């Protein structure tokens, strides 16, 4: 999902004026807002006139590499990343550069966005750059020196052991709640990897306010789902896909990924809570309110790949605060987001045991009854290429030498296995879009 590009472009609808009621509608958070539903109430651009869009301006970053940034629009300013993890503020109407922040650290992977905080007087931009979280003045791009150490905190600190030999990167922005920024991080996918603790930092000082262990410590719920020493050695179970927030109720929703190693779990036997889990946490304290594990003992890298989207559903003449979580398997899980009660039944289905020495795959995995998966669930012979008779014959021969029995088929040492949908999904980090109207 990386794209080689240099330009950050904007298209503006040119043939009509913007009404005063719409001039202050922005894009204040990653994927549109804390609800992560990709929704904007702007309606001048629609299916009837979208073909009339023309390029209004283009900003040349002067760089090459993957550009995945979901820009924020705050007032008349656009905030985004360049491919090398520099932060830019542009005039949203003209594309003119207002300021650029260069940390001096060469960024090696795309970052998907920044986070914005204001109390009506101060305005901060929070930017993840490699192992660090920076706090910038949104008006001029200068570091806020009172935050952490000289305007930044080292995200490796406080996780486990010698932090200088660890790696964690905030490639998806944290989420703002009151005077907190709540973050996860992208961890290595092999040993050694730090645990994927969910942490909340004070936006003014950078001090840690709370932490939730996704690999539970002794005495914490879920500890029994790992080997006894896993909290000292196991890694990841991290939130790399972003979070959603019910701000009025003070609940943050955190989907996590698999534990390391992604495709081998003989050193972490058990269901491995809270890997591959949707967590509902009290945003004030980090206390777990409810959870749902989408994959038990993941050995397929079936992370929850995107933020959940928050919305309201009507059932039996009642309005239910709801949540939709997509998966790499193309499932859509629907929950009452206050209680964790499924809005459609979720059943456990049996799957084969692993034949890999030392590995113990879970014999059941969950699946929602509704809605139906949004991508194909099986690869069969009749789907293979028919471009030429020779190509078809080759594909059929190769396919018959593979194991292809559907979802959650454990890998084997003596035969290759088809993974379908592929490792990237299915659903991916863009997440679902919901029109709340």
Model-identified regions with their sequence ranges:
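N-terminal secretory signal peptides that target proteins for export/translocation
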Residues: 1-5
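Bacterial N-terminal signal peptides
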Residues: 7-19
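N-terminal pre-domain segments of enzymes
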Residues: 21-44, 359-396, 404
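Mature N-terminal segment immediately following signal peptide/propeptide cleavage
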Residues: 22-64, 70-73, 96
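Repeat-blade elements of multi-bladed beta-propeller folds
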Residues: 27-31, 66-84, 108-133, 166-190, ...
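Extracytoplasmic/lumenal domain signature
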Residues: 48-62, 87-107, 120, 133-165, ...
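Short acidic-glycine loop/turn motifs at beta-strand connectors
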Residues: 75, 178, 205, 247-248, ...
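Glycine-rich, aromatic-lined ligand/substrate-binding cores of catalytic
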Residues: 401-437
